[in-house]
Amino acid sequence: KPVFNKEISSEVNVKAIFLNYVNAIGGIDVLNKVKSITTNASVKIPNAPFSPKAEIKQKHPNLNSLVMTVEGMGTLMSQKFDGENGYTEQMGQKIPFEKDQINSEKEKLGLFEEIYLDSSKMEIISLNQIEGKDLYKIKINETTFRYYDAKTYLLIMKEETSSQAGNEIKSITKYSNYKQIGGVLLAHKREVVSGPQTIVFKITSIKLNEEIDDSFFK
């Protein structure tokens, strides 16, 4: 039977957990050399009659793009952020990012956030067993929590609350199947849980340091 709220050693703090995570996935020297990440995935959407493909491109410090396509149907949706502004496009309709969305993207200062996040402003909330693993729950800010494995220090889960059209929406992203790519340990499975729906990204390839022009993110 899982024990909830296990005692946390006084030697453990957010800074130490972030450092252990950075070391676990490759170390700061290796991570600082990564200037872009291109991820391809097959996507499972519940009850959808098709399985989209996703291409995610990230470029240092915070440029990112997600494009989902379906064979024979073209682009299902795309979301882009160019460092200043962003938008989501779906069914030919372009919705610009709201101010808080832009600010939260701008706050990202690199591809591996744990390197530069100010741990002194964050706190460990608990050490609990979730799905058989002991996880440290860290409060990043009022709307974001992250869960790290107490044994491997890998990031297992992220919990975020955002407001869309006046409604609060909570989404959980689970990370698993970590594999090494170019000296960096990266999750090859992501599950995004939003409301009753779980979308599964099964990652088929990851490329580091591909040349990507800034204009791609516009």
Predicted feature residues:
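Gly/Pro-enriched, hydrophobic low-complexity segments
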Residues: 134-218
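N-terminal mature ectodomain segment of secretory-pathway/periplasmic proteins
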Residues: 3, 9, 16-92, 124
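Generic beta-strand structural signal
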Residues: 59, 80-81, 129, 148, ...
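Short, surface-exposed linear segments at secondary-structure transitions and domain or protein termini
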Residues: 61-66, 87-90, 106-110, 180-183, ...
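Short, well-ordered turn and helix-capping elements at secondary-structure junctions
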Residues: 25, 43, 70-72, 126-128, ...
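Short, mixed charged/polar active-site loops
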Residues: 49-53, 74-78, 94, 145, ...
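A generic beta-sheet turn/junction motif
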Residues: 47, 59-60, 70-74, 131, ...
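Flexible, processing/modification-adjacent segments and terminal tails
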Residues: 9-12, 82-144, 163-169, 216-218
